[in-house]
Amino acid sequence: MQGYDEKLIAHSKKPLNHGRLRKYDILYNLDNETCGDGIRVYMRMKGDRLDEIRFDGKGCVVSVAAASMVSRYVKGKTVKEIMGMDDESLKRIIGVKIVRSRLRCANLFLRAVKKGLSS
């Protein structure tokens, strides 16, 4: 894990909201064909708000750490707020520089959440 920011390493080793939800309204799987990362997102809604979220799957340091940080951020947000998020939002939430070649890893979780909410 040499070369990664300490914040990314910490979140990848002990990710927040990792695991499955027993009761969920939405389950969405998404793979990153570029590198082989894959994520499964479980979401429980309360009206138009994301009440609870969990994830599992396999991924690199960047994708797991981003899933951890973004999952904490989106909990309690409305569908509209989440759907309005973009790569700039993601960069602010993560708070560390993500090189362009790893941006697809970093946004895997957010893409899965948004696709799940829109399906």
Name each region found by the language model.
Residues 1-119:
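Domain-level signature for proteins that mediate thiol-based redox and metal-cofactor handling
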